[in-house]
Amino acid sequence: TDRIYPIADVLFSGPMKRCLETAQILYPGQTPICIPEWTEMDFGAFEGHNYQELSGDPAYQRWIDSGGTLPFPEGESREEFIRRNVAGYEKMLCYMKMILERSAASEQGDYNTGSEKTELERSDEIGAQDAGIQSVSAVVHGGTIMALLSHFLGEQYFNYQVKCGQGYSGRLVFLAGGGTPEWKEFRPLSEFTKGETY
């Protein structure tokens, strides 16, 4: 690829084939940790249809007139989609906590090498714990980007719309004493230079 993407010590991905294949192209040799909640929105009765096929459908016109806020017939609402993606983000944070704890325990010689292993340990999906984690990447659908950023940054959902191969980078700050980590210093990936970490 000619595009520039940040390096990733840990790689996450949505579970759909497009995300997994893209993750392998952008990060060859790394196996992403799949977050099942990061699938595309359920378009219900509109799934697989284009604008021409749906024009004239009263349900589609109601959805358009709502600015995309109504639920898709037999599908998800935007709010449901955002909640699902936020649940996936929280799962990603749990994985990160597990990875960091495992790394710290390994440094202290306390790492469990017995048969009682977590799903993450069994899958052997992480490769950079020993060197420390400096950067994490997630290969996801544009809708997941819009859902998560609008939820956490409070701006309009469509303000974060991206084209294929585009995305954002930011710094996640973990607060002393726990609590919800805060996102800082967002910028589009197009502002990166090759091999830069964030």
Stretches found by the model and what they are:
Residues T1-Q30:
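Active-site-proximal alpha-helix that buttresses catalytic centers in soluble enzyme cores
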Residues D2, I82, V86-K97, E101:
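Generic structural signal for well-ordered alpha-helical scaffold segments
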Residues D9, I133-G142:
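Generic beta-sheet signal
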Residues S13-G14, R83, V139-V140:
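Short beta-strand scaffold positions
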Residues K17-C19, G88, T144-I145:
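Alpha-helix capping/helix-boundary segments
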Residues I25, A147-H151:
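Active-site signature of alpha/beta-hydrolase-fold catalytic machinery across serine-
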Residues L26-V86, Y198:
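Phosphate-handling substructures
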Residues G44-Q52, C94, M98-S103, G109-G114, ...:
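Acidic, low-complexity terminal tails and accessory targeting/binding regions
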